[in-house]
Curated annotation (Swiss-Prot):
It comes from the Eukaryota. Residues 1597-1610 have a biased composition (Polar residues). This is Histone transcription regulator 3. InterPro entries: Hir3/CABIN1. Residues 301-371, 1597-1630 are annotated as: Disordered. Present with 922 molecules/cell in log phase SD medium. Belongs to the HIR3 family. One of its GO terms (molecular function) is transcription corepressor activity. The lineage of its organism: Eukaryota, Fungi, Dikarya, Ascomycota, Saccharomycotina. GO terms for cellular component: chromosome; HIR complex; nucleus. HIR1, HIR2 and HIR3 are repressors of histone gene transcription. They are required for the periodic repression of three of the four histone gene loci during cell cycle as well as for autogenous regulation of the HTA1-HTB1 locus by H2A and H2B. Also has a role in nucleosome assembly. It comes from Saccharomyces cerevisiae (strain ATCC 204508 / S288c). Disruption phenotype: Abolishes localization of RTT106 to the HTA1-HTB1 promoter.
Length: 1648
């Protein structure tokens, strides 16, 4: 569709007119529909009328948009919309009048509201008529909406038509309806209490004095509005009644009342209430206007026993809920774990899911169980036997055999057991009946764990301060009764009688529970009675919800509410204690506690506010209130101040004096507060003593004393003396504080453990390893004494189990701390002397925990025993950690004892112990428990013993720790179920050193076979160590600078001279850092050696990339800068650079044809040479050179000589021996003596003679060194390449002057190569050199044929020729002797080709072609040989098909390619094969990256092509364009060319002509010059056009002399003159070269 708009057209106007027309049609349609709807409404056909109205409101001009707005507005539209809404409102009203009796109340209200909605909407579009306002006024009056009724009345009065009547001009025409509305309005103003308006304003405004005294008549209601009015009155009556919530109580108890009230509110966490300071009541949807309690009779008659069981179940559920975020603590009922919370809910399907559903005989089943039990116990029997044997090696008495150990658990009942077996059987029973209670006890260790900062450690001491207070509290007799029912009954009665709001009931409940119930004595329910724990939580929840309101209330009524304030203060302090305890538990478990700390801060802030308020209320006159307040304040100080804070002592002193002065018999239990101890005079005095004692034994001195270290040592010494005196009373200790001894001796067992933990942790913090170990063994002695004490034996099973698990937890914590500090010291031995009895204690402790493993094995066959590891994953995990820690300590101390007592057998004994322990733990799948401490120590110890046994176990360790699988023929590690960890740098160094020493066993890694199985581990070790060159170490930086400076220096004669005298050095300095030992051992060197070996393998399969060498170069440089003085590293570094150079030279010629890229290769080549030079210098500087050193440096000499040759000859052409300064400009003195600046140029730093001498020196030394090595090692195989390279270089540079010496080296190389290479794949290069040298010497006349054959016969073991082959017929002429000699040379060269299995050798074939062409004149034979190397006629893209042999110099490949193409072109020119030459030209254009000097080759090939074509086809040079084309008649040319195109048949012409024309035309198209024009035009005219033109001329009139004769082939005729008698014609058009080529193109398209 066209988008063109005429200038005189108005698109918008046209659209507007169309819309206006459409709108007018819609308006007309709307009025018609409205008329139909009114007719139906008049006929009371409500269904049709309703459908009409629905149709009406679907029309756009009537229907508003989604926002209630209209797009267009006009008087007509406003009138239409008014009528539509007005009449639909009347429709709803009329419908109600006719159908109200059939409608229910809801339908009636909905319908009348629709009428109101439509009528009100109509008023927005136009002034309403009186019928609308009158109906609305009546409806509003029926709804008793006085304001709306007044509004609609005033709307009617203010209408324009009524104003004109009311202003007096037509007052007599005032209608009765309006008068009635006015009277009703007067009544409304009286109801709305607007006397001014009703008395004065309205009558003055509208002059209605005469109506003032008329009694207003009420608006008449129809039956519908009367019914609505009645419904409205009923609703108002209902709204006046209170919404009473009937709360059903299950029993008459405070906790039931509190729970019922809480259930009325939405559930909100207490932590949320603390943070948000909100009242949950604000979140309810409907207000609670009144509360009434009802007692459920059915549940009330339930026996109390059932209710008690329900309460216990509820407590269990609550504990299970708390299990997710709390850890174990010795205090019961607070903390659960999620693993043992439901010990009795193990499903049968979990137990029996693996059992086969089949029947078996009982006898068979019993026998099977016995056999399986024996198999299960085999691991224990084997361990006990091996372990006791290992103990005997270090002269330690065996612990016991397995049968003795097992007998502890199979003796009869506990009362018949020996006393020493009781702890074992108790532990066995705990495991058998493990529950959540045991988890709580076992997983607590807050009394031992030291804080990460000073405040946490002080909190630990505060816990010590509280410990006895709570123990004393628990010792109170349970004389407190539950809350009695009298108070609750009175409370329920008061609430039910008063119709109280929820706020009133809640506040009244708090006053009852927290306030006083005996005003005279200040007695409180929360102090005098024992509450349910749930009640206390709900009360606290209520307090946090309305705390700010209560605080404001109490602040206004201090005297009346003082005990309520005290109770709230106590609740907050107790809750602070709960939060602090939970923070401690989470810290112990390593969980985050930021939210809890935030709660703690907010609660502390609230407590301080209440404290300030209570300080205003409480005074010493009110003794009881004052004592309670001070005691609670003392408890608060324990959580907020240090143990040495003077406020603690001052508060206790004040309390003590007050109690003594008032009532010494004061005894308050605080039964409902967990964190507020019982209050009496003895408790206060006990707390004072504890503060003094604890301050004396506090490890950290908080004061700013300069002698704090001395005080700390004194405190530790005092505490240690007291604890040791209690542990060993017979020991005499001077200066013992008897009061402290008595206090600690009489303290509970838990406090003693905590004090030992404080002493132990203090030494740990001071990193005093000897003291830590000494205290650890004292603690083991203390624990053993506790479990064998009479108190333990006489306790009931419940008490023994609790004490036993506490001991296990303490041992586990201390063992973990000891292993941690020993690990931080890298398990180095200290001056601590381990006595035999100490080691025996450690063994006894380990085998006590061994009960767990024995039980786990017993559970396999005993149905009554459930697996502890599967049932309690968290607790069993901790148990595994403890056992691993103990085993780690045993291994550590065993290794120390073996080192002292049996140093010769230390490695064997320690390795066997690791085997035994690891096998045991691996069997139970937890050898990596306790963060892999056992594996860590085992790895460290095994790395000290370099033997195969240790390596086998180390393989197992590496799998279990890092999941490194090292395969071997005789051992494969067991795949234990462990979690792999990342290797750390501190572990990688000794492991790498160990692997190197084990792998090479003092052998030189360079000459040893590399084990690829260890490469993964070595790579990971190197990765963890990182790049040392990036370390912030000035020595490393200096060494790196010196290394880089050396690699950027030029190659000079002095450098070469110093190299072979061992005088070249970098003068590096050893960093002697943490990596020095590993570097000296060869970590980076061996890793780079392995990586380079892998690179070589990949390089052979052409899968390697030079970028892989970057990491190897980096590792070798790191090895060098650590001053390892290892010449092997320099050799490897040189090899890396050599491989980079080789890769750049062998693939494409681009990098050797572009100068910039060639400079980069030269730079790398120079680095390789420098590396080899440094390696040789280090070798010659060594005084003690081993035979291994000689073997290695022999390879370096060969590599250096080869690299020098590569840099000296093409294609590099001595570029690496030139050097350019890094500066762009240099300053020099000119001839006139002036200082001038010029661009820096490359300079050659060494002469050709010195380079050649260096090459000779390298190979000469290599040859002599080979002989020296051979004399020392008969097995050594001489290196043929040294002799070969020396002979080849000598041959090239000598010019035949020393041919005998060259021949000697060549024959030696041939002999060594023949002996060292397999017969199936022999080395070709030295044999070819011998043949080629003899050929060239004979041709140059250096030697005769007889001498040459004699030399060649020395290699007859390779050529395998008959004796007569080597005989020369001297009777022949010299030229015939040479010819026969050349034939023999060709035969030998063909033999070389025949033994080349890879078919990579191409030089012999080239030499054959060259001899055939140059010496024998056999062009076709030579061309046949070259055709096997050059594929000019094939579709293959490559022009020269040769491969680089292994020993060919990199880059020489492209030089050879150039030589072969030059020879091939010479051969083609010799036979004038221009078509083949053209094919070579076509391929040569795309073969640019396959050879050098491609432009020179192209020029040569084009010249050969054109000359060959002109000679062979006898074409004229340039005559076609300059002479023939101007003489051609244009019309005649078109005619003959067209005829030629029609009659052309490729088969009628020789292949050489048709193919030549096509090829010449293709070459002309692909070339921008005119080089191929003459050949293309010549073939066209001479062989196609002119023959046809001559044939056509013979058919014309031979008598017509005016027609010019056509030029003959190969001749040029003069221009023909036109006939002078002919008439003038148009100017003759000349035939152009383009037109000729267009005709050629048509013919070429037909040639296939």
């Amino acid at each position: 569709m066209s988008m063109f708009n005429a200038l005189n057209s108005n698109i918008e106007g046209e659209q507007y007119e169309a819309e206006e027309h459409s709108r007018e049609l819609q308006i007309e349609q709307s009025f018609n529909i409205l008329q139909d709807a009114l007719i139906d409404l008049k006929n009371k056909d409500f269904e049709k009328s309703d459908s009409k109205f629905q149709e009406l409101f679907q029309i756009d001009v009537v229907k508003p948009d989604r926002w209630g707005m209209y797009r267009n507005s006009s008087p007509t539209l406003d009138n239409l919309r008014y009528l539509c809404y007005r009449n639909r409102g009347m429709y709803y009203h009329l419908y109600l009048e006719n159908n109200y009796e059939r409608l229910n109340s809801q339908e009636l209200v909905n319908c009348i509201l629709k009428a109101v909605e439509n009528l009100v909407e109509s008023i927005q579009h136009s002034d309403a008529d009186f019928a609308v306002t009158d109906l609305l006024a009546r409806i509003f009056k029926s709804f008793n909406s006085v304001k709306l009724e007044r509004l609609i009345s005033e709307y009617e009065f203010t209408k324009q038509e009524n104003l004109s009547l009311l202003l007096g001009r037509h007052r007599k025409f005032l209608l009765n309806d309006l008068t009635l509305m006015m009277n009703n309005y007067v009544e409304l103003t009286n109801k709305l209490l607007v006397p001014n308006l009703s008395d004065n304003t309205i009558f003055e405004r509208y002059h209605l004095e005469k109506y003032k005294d008329i009694k207003p008549e009420p608006l008449a209601f129809g039956p519908i509005l009367s019914r609505i009015s009645e419904m409205k009155k009923q609703d108002e009556e209902i709204m006046k009644k209170l919404d009473v919530f009937n709360v059903t109580l299950n029993e008459e108890s405070w906790d039931e009342v509190a729970k019922a009230l809480k259930n009325l509110l939405p559930s909100v966490k207490t932590s949320s209430l603390i943070g948000r300071n909100m009242d949950p009541y604000n979140e309810i949807e409907e207000p609670i206007e009144a509360v009434k309690f009802e007692l459920s009779e059915a549940i009330n008659n339930t026996p109390s026993l059932d209710r008690e069981s329900e309460r216990q179940e509820e407590e269990q559920d609550n504990e299970s809920v708390r299990a997710d975020d709390k850890s174990g603590n010795l205090a019961p009922s607070d903390i659960q774990t999620n693993e043992e919370a439901r010990p009795n809910k193990r499903t049968d399907e979990h137990i029996d899911s693996t059992k086969p559903l089949q029947r078996s005989s009982k006898r068979f089943k019993e026998r099977e169980q016995e056999n399986s039990k024996e198999l299960v116990m085999d691991v224990h029997k084997r361990f006990f036997g091996e372990f006791n044997t290992l103990l005997s090696y270090i002269h330690i008495l065996p612990f016991c055999d397995f049968d003795t150990f097992a007998s502890k658990f199979i003796i009869g009942s506990s009362d018949k057991q020996p006393e020493k077996f009781i702890p074992y059987t108790d532990l066995y029973e705990c495991l058998k009946s493990w529950s959540s209670r045991y988890t709580d006890i076992f997983n607590q260790n807050d009394y031992l764990s030291s804080g990460s900062n000073e405040n946490e450690e002080l909190f630990q001491l505060n816990a010590l301060l509280k410990s006895n207070a709570f123990d004393d509290k628990e010792s109170f007799p349970r004389y407190l009764n539950d809350l009695d029912s009298d108070h609750i009954r009175s409370f329920i009665s008061e609430v039910n009688a008063g119709n109280l709001h929820f706020h009133q009931v809640r506040l009244k409940l708090l006053f009852k529970l927290l306030g006083t119930y005996d005003e005279g004595n200040g007695r409180r329910l929360i102090i005098d009675y024992l509450w349910e724990s749930q009640l206390l939580k709900i009360v606290l929840w209520f307090v946090f919800g309305i705390e700010s309101n209560i605080f404001a209330l109490i602040n206004k009524n201090k005297r009346q509410c003082k005990y309520l304030a005290l109770s709230i203060y106590e609740l907050l302090v107790n809750h602070l204690g709960n939060i602090v305890e939970e923070i401690t538990n989470k810290r112990i478990q390593g969980h985050k506690s930021a939210d809890l700390k935030s709660q703690r801060n907010k609660v502390e802030k609230r407590i301080r506010s209440w404290h300030t308020l209570l300080e205003q209320i409480a005074d010493e006159k009110d003794k009881e209130l004052y004592v309670h307040f001070q005691w609670t304040h003392y408890c608060f100080l324990q959580y907020t101040c240090d143990i040495v804070d003077s406020r603690l002592s001052e508060t206790l002193t004040s309390l003590e004096n007050t109690i003594k002065d008032s009532d010494s018999s004061l005894d308050i239990a605080y039964p409902n507060y967990r964190h507020i101890p019982a209050l009496n005079l003895n408790t206060v005095q006990s707390q004072k003593r504890k503060i003094r004692i604890i301050q004396n034994i506090t490890v950290e001195d908080i004061s700013e004393d300069t002698n704090s270290d001395t005080h700390s040592e004194n405190h530790l010494e005092t505490l240690e003396k007291v604890l040791l005196h209690i542990l060993h009373p017979s020991t005499n200790h001077s200066n013992i504080d008897e009061e402290m001894v008595s206090f600690i001796f009489n303290s509970p067992f838990l406090l003693k453990i905590r004090l030992w933990g404080v002493l132990f942790s203090s030494y740990v913090k001071k990193s005093s390893i000897q003291d830590v170990q000494r205290i650890y063994f004292h603690v083991l002695d203390f624990m053993k004494g506790a479990l064998t004490s009479p108190v333990y034996k006489e306790s009931n099973p419940h008490g023994r189990h609790q004490m036993l698990l506490t001991v296990l937890t303490a041992i586990g914590y201390l063992s973990s701390q000891l292993t941690a500090i020993l690990n931080s010291n890298r398990w180095e031995s200290s001056d601590f002397v381990l006595e035999d009895y100490m080691f025996e204690k450690l063994l006894q402790t380990f085998f006590f925990f061994y009960t767990v493993l024995f039980y786990e094995s017993s559970a396999v066959n005993d149905v009554s025993n459930k697996s502890f590891f599967k049932r309690a994953s968290k607790s069993s995990g901790k148990m595994k950690d403890i056992m691993i820690d103990l085993a780690t300590l045993i291994l550590y101390y065993y290794d120390l004892q073996a080192k002292l007592r049996t140093p010769a057998e230390q490695g064997i004994e320690t390795t066997e112990l690791i085997w035994s322990l690891h096998t045991l733990f691996g069997h139970f799948h937890f050898c990596d428990a306790s963060n892999g401490k056992f594996l860590d120590l085992a790895e460290k110890l095994l790395c000290q013993f370099i033997n195969n046994d240790s390596f086998l176990q180390l393989k197992q360790i590496l799998w279990c720790r890092y999941h490194y699988a090292i395969a071997s023929d005789n051992f494969s590690p067991d795949l234990h179920d462990t979690k792999a960890v990342e290797m750390e740098k501190i572990h990688s160094l000794p492991l790498g050193t160990y692997l190197i020493k084990l792998q090479y066993q003092n052998k030189n890694p360079y000459l040893s076979s590399s084990k690829t199985t260890l490469k993964q581990i070595m790579d990971n070790i190197i990765e963890k160590i990182g790049d040392p060159s990036t370390l912030d170490n000035h020595i490393i930086s200096r060494n790196s600078f010196l290394l880089n400076e050396y690699l950027s220096r030029p190659i000079t004669a002095d450098l070469l001279k110093h190299t072979f005298s061992g005088a070249t050095s970098l003068y590096l300095t050893s960093p002697n850092d943490e990596l020095q030992q590993g570097m000296t051992a060869g970590l980076f060197y061996v890793s780079s050696l392995q990586s380079l070996g892998l690179y070589k393998m990949r390089k052979k399969s052409m899968q390697a990339r030079p970028s892989e060498l970057d990491s190897i170069i980096r590792m070798l440089k790191n090895d060098i800068i650590y001053n390892t003085n290892r010449f092997e590293s320099w050799i490897l570094l040189g090899k890396c650079y050599s491989y980079i150079v080789e890769d750049d030279l062998i693939w494409t010629s681009d990098k050797i044809t572009v100068p910039e890229k060639k400079d980069v290769i030269a730079l790398t080549q120079r680095k390789a040479i420098l590396c080899y030079l440094m390696a040789i210098s280090i070798y010659y500087s060594k005084l003690d050179r081993t035979i291994d050193d000689k073997k290695i440096i022999l390879e370096a000499l060969d590599d250096l000589g080869s690299m020098l040759i590569s840099g000296y000859y093409n294609p590099m052409n001595k570029l690496c021996f030139s050097w350019k300064s890094s500066a762009e400009n240099t300053m020099r003195l000119s001839e006139t003596g002036e200082v001038v600046m010029e661009k820096t140029k490359k300079i050659t730093t060494i002469s050709d003679f010195n380079i050649e001498q260096s090459i000779f020196l390298c190979f000469n030394r290599a040859c002599s060194l080979s002989g020296d090595i051979k004399s020392q090692d008969d097995v050594f195989v001489l290196n043929w390449s040294s002799f070969y390279n020396l002979a080849k270089f000598f041959f090239k540079t000598d010019g035949g002057n020393n041919c005998k010496l060259v021949a000697k080296y060549i024959t030696q190389g041939c002999q060594i190569a023949y002996e060292s290479s397999p017969a199936k794949d022999p080395i070709i290069e030295p044999h070819y050199l011998l043949v080629n040298a003899c050929y060239k010497w004979v041709k140059r006349g250096v030697i005769g044929v007889n001498e040459a054959l004699t030399l060649l016969s020395k290699d007859n073991q390779f050529f395998q020729e008959q004796e007569e082959f080597w005989v020369n017929d001297e009777g022949l002429a010299w030229d015939y002797q040479e010819k026969f000699f050349f034939d023999k040379i060709i035969r030998l060269l063909r033999h070389l080709l025949s033994v080349d299995k890879k078919k990579w050798q191409h030089r012999p074939r080239y030499r054959i072609a060259r001899i055939l062409f140059d010496d024998l004149g056999d062009v076709n034979g030579a061309l046949e040989e070259m055709d096997s190397l050059i594929s000019a006629k094939s579709i293959n893209k490559n022009l020269v098909n040769i491969w680089k042999p292994d020993f060919e110099r990199p880059g020489k490949h492209f030089i050879y390619t150039y030589q072969y193409l030059v020879l091939y072109l010479d051969l083609l020119f010799a036979i004038k094969d221009f078509n083949t030459t053209g094919l070579v030209i076509k391929k040569l254009r795309r073969f640019g990256s396959g050879t050098v000097n491609v432009n020179e080759l192209l020029e040569r090939a084009i010249n050969v092509y054109t000359q060959s074509a002109k000679i062979k086809l006898q074409l004229q040079d340039k005559s076609y364009v300059e002479q023939i084309l101007p003489t051609l008649n244009y019309q005649e040319f078109l005619k003959i060319s067209e005829q030629l195109n029609q009659v052309f048949d490729q088969g009628k012409y020789p292949e050489e002509i048709s193919s030549g024309l096509k090829l010449a035309f293709q070459l002309k198209k692909g070339h921008s010059g005119i080089a191929f024009d003459s050949v293309c035009l010549g073939i066209y005219f001479e062989y196609l056009y002119f023959p046809l033109a001559r044939q056509d001329q013979s058919l014309t009139d031979v008598n017509d002399e005016n027609n010019p004769a056509l030029p003959s082939s190969g001749s040029v005729t003069s221009k023909s003159t036109p006939d002078p008698t002919s008439k003038p014609s148009a100017i003759k058009k000349r035939v152009t070269k383009k037109e000729v080529f267009d005709r050629v193109r048509l013919l070429v398209d037909k040639i296939t």
